[in-house]
Swiss-Prot record:
The keyword Transcription is assigned to this record: no
Name of this protein: Peptidase E
Known role: Hydrolyzes dipeptides containing N-terminal aspartate residues. May play a role in allowing the cell to use peptide aspartate to spare carbon otherwise required for the synthesis of the aspartate family of amino acids.
Organism: Salmonella paratyphi B (strain ATCC BAA-1250 / SPB7)
EC number: 3.4.13.21
Catalytic activity as recorded in UniProt: Dipeptidase E catalyzes the hydrolysis of dipeptides Asp-|-Xaa. It does not act on peptides with N-terminal Glu, Asn or Gln, nor does it cleave isoaspartyl peptides
Enzyme class: hydrolase
Lineage: superkingdom: Bacteria
A single GO cellular-component term on record: cytoplasm
Length: 229
């Protein structure tokens, strides 16, 4: 499988997806036809989200079609060489994808050679479940099971920092709560600016920041760029 799972879409001082464009270009391998799944968008319309994505990827020669615009979404997925899933609200993304019957077709198409690109919520959707999203559950997705393309759970935008005086839980504490009730899971705390690239059966960590791996009953383990999962 070919996956590019990004923690986030924007870095300080850079344009939207700018840091990801070299990674995307390197993994295209001649692919040009893409479908974009914009359902995580809440405060922007799906048309706006699709148009923005198409504009950014056009210089790479990628032709982007919004899945919500086509008459036959399943046929569009089958024909697509690239499947792109944008960030936003993970619960809405999963709900819309499930209700439209897209989960199994997307997973199948990626397993048969389509490149999957997802950032933030799109990275969450590639995991076995969305249980490590940071998002508010604004809708009920009728279950948390997702695409299961990547075998570990990703927590995007990972940071353990708290504002001064803040008394809420740290991100690690939230993850530890999950591991109490689901000790079989492994969670990757993927900070902004980092990514996981899967190609030729190898999953490799990239990015400038330390990534953390959490398992039940174990201390967190720090990983740096180049680590192979």
């Amino acid at each position: 499988m070919e996956l590019l799972l990004l923690s986030n879409s924007t870095l300080p001082g850079k344009a939207w997806l700018e840091h990801a464009l070299p990674l995307i270009a390197n993994q295209l391998n001649g692919r040009r036809s893409a479908v974009f799944i914009p359902f995580a968008g809440v405060t922007q319309t799906w048309d706006e989200y699709t148009d923005k994505t198409a504009e950014v990827l056009a210089p790479l020669g990628v032709n982007v079609t919004g899945i919500h615009r086509v008459a036959d979404p399943l046929a569009a997925i089958e024909k697509a060489e690239i499947i792109i899933v944008g960030g936003g609200n993970t619960f809405q993304l999963l709900k819309e994808s499930r209700e439209r019957g897209l989960l199994a077709p997307v997973a199948d198409r990626v397993k048969r050679g389509a490149l999957y690109i997802g950032w933030s919520a799109g990275a969450n959707l590639a995991c076995p479940t969305i249980r490590t999203t940071n998002d508010m559950p604004i809708v009920d997705p009728n279950g948390f099971d997702a695409l299961d393309l990547f075998p570990l759970q990703i927590n995007p935008h990972f940071t353990n920092a708290l504002p001064e005086g803040h008394k809420g839980e740290t991100r690690e504490q939230r993850i530890r709560e999950l591991l109490v009730v689901a000790p079989e899971l492994t969670v990757i705390g993927l900070p902004e600016g980092n990514w996981i690239q899967v190609s030729n059966g190898q999953a490799v960590l990239g990015g400038p920041n330390t990534t953390w791996v959490f398992k039940a009953g174990e201390e967190a383990v720090a990983l740096e760029a180049g680590h192979r999962f």
